[in-house]
Amino acid sequence: MLTSQYLLSTSKDIPYDAKIISHQLMIRSGMIRKTSSGLYVWLPTGMRVLKKIKNIITTEMEKINALEILMPIIQPEYLWKESGRLNLYGEELLRFLDRRKNQFILGPTNEEVVTNFIGSEIHSYKQLPLTVYQIQTKFRDEIRPRFGIIRTREFTMKDAYSFHINQSCLENTYNKFYDSYINIFKKMNLNFCAVKADSGSMGGNISHEFQAFSQNGEDEIVFSNDKLYSSNMNMAESIETIDFFKKKYSSCLIKNKTNTKKSIIMSEKLNTPLINQIQTFLIQTKINDITSIAALLIRGDHELNFFKVEKIDIINKPLVFLNEKEVISLIGVKKEFLGPLGLKVPIIADISTFNMKNFTIGSNINKHFFINVNWNIDLPMPIFKDIRKVTKNDLSPNGSGYLNIKQSIEIGHIFQLGQKYSRKIQQSVKIKNGNLKNLYMGCYGIGITRIAAAVIEQHHDKNGIIWPDSIAPFEVVILPINMKKDNKIKIIAHFLYKKFKKTGIDVILDDRDERPGVMFNEVDLIGIPHQIIISKRSINYDNVEYRERKNKENILINIKDIKNFIIQKLKK
């Protein structure tokens, strides 16, 4: 490729809404351009990166005998009604009518479609197992698209689906995908980990997320310092420390007046640390199809884990908290003064409050709190559940390490779906005895466009992107200095360019009449890993200058040796 025939589209400007480094560098390096909220045009440089990511994924899919297909992005709505996910997905689904008033959606995922058509293609257990995959654009109507391509409305995914006659066969394929994903992300030089995860709206009982570490990640992953435990934040558990306080029980209830509104200020006014306070939240419940209210109790320095709360049978999904107006109407007090004493509703407390003594609660009277409160003396024991987010230095569930928490970007997710979709969409095969049996199913996703951002988050410096060789838009760039003024430089530049092209090296030659500073700045910004600089000074000694993007080390290499040198570099 010659730069004179290429659309570089680099920029010095950073859009006001580009808050994280990957978004900024993707704009500045000419990879993407925004057309609307959560919608982006992929320019040639970005497309070259995506193509290489896809090639790595396709190669690994072929190794595990996954067959490539392509499904329509537009899906009939009735399939989603059959699976029960139409209402579950809610407003993230873009729904529309065609000219005949038929109902369709713009697909965010393809479990319904693939189950429907595979069920009509497979008639016997002898055709199983079968795995298919596609690389396709998806659409989810995100309420708040943000962080560039990390959270968009339109994105490219590799989604795969496997079909089996029994659970053990499903588990075998699931493990193959797990190992395949490890290989894929290693080839992209990502710092990542696989963690146990919740299946969410996808269904099934077992799933794993693949998370790339990033301080700008939306997700949080939890792992022990002994590396024996890992989980996403939703699923993370800890062993509760025993008996935080050594104070004696007191049955004394004391009203303490304060003008405090916020918890942390309240703590200072009462001289009571947050660790010795219990917060109360009121939420909607549904018992025997009757909507009611329940109270959640959590330690003052902890945070509710919405995912864990939603797992409780009586809790409405999604969670609905009573607002200030509703609390005042029901209890007659502002939310910050809510407490469990005297509430005639089910009370669910986090297990971390079990061993608390002489703690502080709201009194259900404005500007008043109760202190020195104890279970079984002043308050009846509530229902205890694990409803909080773990915190750093909590004891690991295995008891042999302490928990750490890091931010991350989800780049892949695999699920054992079991028979969820085949039962609802009624797809089955004949087994040996002639009876029909519902298919077992797994699904396996990789966020292709999101991977590009995750790699940039991990591989960049003040000058731009530092792509690994495997997914760089170009492997090598040739930078001839003052080529328009020196014909010998031009001849050598084109000679090396043709030599690299013939060898199969992905090379670009900067044949523009640009100042050296502009050329160097642009290739550093774009992140091309291997740079060959041809100048009058170097060719006088039959040399060219080699510079590696990641360490900026400059080496003089003889012209006749540079091809083999680059080949060896690319093999590393």
Swiss-Prot record:
Family that this chain belongs to: Belongs to the class-II aminoacyl-tRNA synthetase family. ProS type 1 subfamily.
GO CC list: cytosol
GO terms assigned for molecular function: aminoacyl-tRNA deacylase activity; ATP binding; proline-tRNA ligase activity
Protein name: Proline--tRNA ligase
Biological process terms in GO annotation: prolyl-tRNA aminoacylation
Cross-referenced NCBIfam families: PRK09194.1, proS_fam_II
Enzyme Commission number(s): 6.1.1.15
Domain of life per record: Bacteria
Pfam families the UniProt entry points to: HGTP_anticodon, tRNA-synt_2b, tRNA_edit
Physiological role: Catalyzes the attachment of proline to tRNA(Pro) in a two-step reaction: proline is first activated by ATP to form Pro-AMP and then transferred to the acceptor end of tRNA(Pro). As ProRS can inadvertently accommodate and process non-cognate amino acids such as alanine and cysteine, to avoid such errors it has two additional distinct editing activities against alanine. One activity is designated as 'pretransfer' editing and involves the tRNA(Pro)-independent hydrolysis of activated Ala-AMP.
Organism: Buchnera aphidicola subsp. Acyrthosiphon pisum (strain Tuc7)
Reaction catalysis annotation: tRNA(Pro) + L-proline + ATP = L-prolyl-tRNA(Pro) + AMP + diphosphate
